[in-house]
Each structure stands twice: as C-alpha cells, then as structure tokens.
C-alpha cells in the first residue's frame, strides 16, 4: 500500500544533495505537516547525519521552523523517551528524526509522511519494520531507500518480493519540477542556498566528530551482513570509504 522506492547512487558526491531533495520534496508536499524519519546503520552515523542536517535546515523549504532530532541506543532511556515524545508531538512545523533501528519497531509515531533509509537494513524483517513507521492508520506515506551499487544484491535477493520501484535521480528531479509548476507545492525554497549550507554543515561535522571511528563503525556494520550482500570485505571497504569522504567532504 505504501509507495516504496529505491535509488541506486554510483556517484557518492550526489548522496547528500539527493537526500536534501527528498526532504525538500516532502516539505513542498506537506508544508508544516512534513514529518520524516531517516534510518541509518550505526549510532555514529546517526549522530553525524544529525549534526549535518541541523546545519542545513535553513536551506530547506521549512527553513528555521524545521526541527531535527536524534535518537539512538547510546542515549539514556530518559532522553530517548523525551526525544520520542517531542517528535510525536510535532504537528505544526516540519520535523526530521535521525535514528538507528531503536525506532524501527515498538514505537508509534503518528502522521509520519516519509521514511528514508540511508543504505540497506540488516534484514528483510527490519526493512518491513522501518517502512511500517509511515502510512499508519490509513494515512498517506512513502518510503525511499538510497543505496550504493554494492548493496544491490541485498535488494535483489532479500527484498525480491517487496514492491520496490526503482527511482532515478533524474526522474525525481522531474517530479520536483512538475510539483513546482503545478502550483500545488505547500512552500518553496531557494536552491542556491543549499550548496553553501552543505559546505558549512560538513565543516561542523568534521570539526566535532572522529571520522575514522565513523568509517570503522559503518564498515563493520556492512561486514557483519556481507553474506546477505553477497560481496567480499574488499568490495565493501572502498565504496564505504568513498561514501564517507563524499558525504562529509573529506579530502
């Protein structure tokens, strides 16, 4: 019932711009009702992407009204409960939750307009749980998954019976243009601000996080599921290195 899309991105420098386009698309569709969950594979990546998007929200259609929250297993139970309640309560301004799989099951967030997965999950079951956070109680919803080419084996063999639709970045850009031209967009944005915001956000993350630790945690999370991916450690290492470098602007 929920439209589900997978976008394969060979050029890692396009990952962050495309993620921002998905967020822009959701805010243009739903305005202040936009409520997006972004799933990542590790605690470190969740924290890094949270810092990144916190610095970029002013370039999104919702601008400073957009709230960006972070939730993962290293937070205390008290803090996790507080963040969950905050995200659950947002109804009159756009909100984004960066999270690990602690939010994939057993938590009911009403009115989530979109789920975005950065990379494949650890199992088909987890994929279903993640997607299940949107479109609840008969409401509209959508699921997007952004993958690198080395992850395509997981999609082909583990998610073969899931109604995933391939979505190219070009087709999505076309749908964005059509939305703007239709005058149905709830809000607009200034695309020229995005690059400046990305550069500043990358600098903030690099200055405050251990990038080697980040790389190791993401790499190890994929190594643990290499049989499902049907690739070797070496086939994982180089793409993950390129992904981290491109997304966070490393030399």
Please report, for each region that a protein language model flagged, where it lies by residue.
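Conserved nucleotide-binding/hydrolysis micro-motifs of P-loop NTPases
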Residues: 12-13, 42-46, 75-77, 102-105, ...
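Conserved helicase ATPase core of P-loop NTP-dependent helicases/translocases
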Residues: 46-104
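A short beta-strand element within the Helicase C-terminal
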Residues: 105-120, 141-146
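Conserved interdomain hinge at the start of the Helicase C-terminal
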Residues: 1-59, 203, 217-222
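Conserved catalytic network of the ASCE P-loop NTPase/AAA+ motor domain
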Residues: 1, 25-32, 59-64, 86-92, ...
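Non-catalytic terminal extensions of ATP-dependent helicases
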Residues: 46-47, 51, 69, 179-251
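Conserved segment of the helicase C-terminal RecA-like domain
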Residues: 126-180
């Amino acid at each position: 019932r929920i439209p589900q899309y997978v976008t394969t991105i060979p050029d890692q420098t396009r990952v962050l711009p495309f993620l921002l386009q998905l967020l822009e698309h959701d805010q243009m569709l739903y305005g202040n009702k936009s409520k997006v969950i972004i799933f990542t594979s590790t605690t470190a990546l969740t924290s890094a992407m949270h810092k990144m998007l916190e610095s970029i929200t002013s370039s999104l259609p919702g601008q400073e009204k957009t709230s960006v929250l972070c939730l993962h297993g290293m937070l205390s139970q008290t803090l996790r409960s507080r963040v969950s309640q905050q995200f659950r309560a947002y109804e009159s301004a756009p909100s984004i939750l960066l999270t690990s799989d602690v939010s994939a099951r057993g938590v009911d967030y009403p009115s989530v307009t979109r789920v975005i997965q950065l990379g494949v999950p650890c199992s088909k079951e987890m994929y279903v749980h993640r997607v299940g956070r949107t479109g609840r109680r008969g409401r509209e919803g959508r699921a997007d998954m952004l993958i690198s080419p080395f992850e395509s084996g997981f999609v082909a063999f583990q998610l073969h019976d899931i109604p995933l639709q391939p979505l190219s970045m070009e087709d999505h850009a076309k749908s964005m243009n059509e939305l703007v031209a239709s005058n149905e967009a709830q809000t607009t944005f200034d695309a020229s601000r995005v690059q400046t915001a990305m550069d500043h956000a990358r600098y903030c993350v690099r200055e405050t996080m251990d990038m080697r630790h980040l790389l190791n945690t993401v790499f190890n999370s994929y190594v643990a599921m290499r049989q499902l991916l049907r690739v070797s450690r070496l086939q994982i290492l180089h793409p993950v290195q390129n992904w981290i470098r491109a997304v966070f602007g490393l030399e």
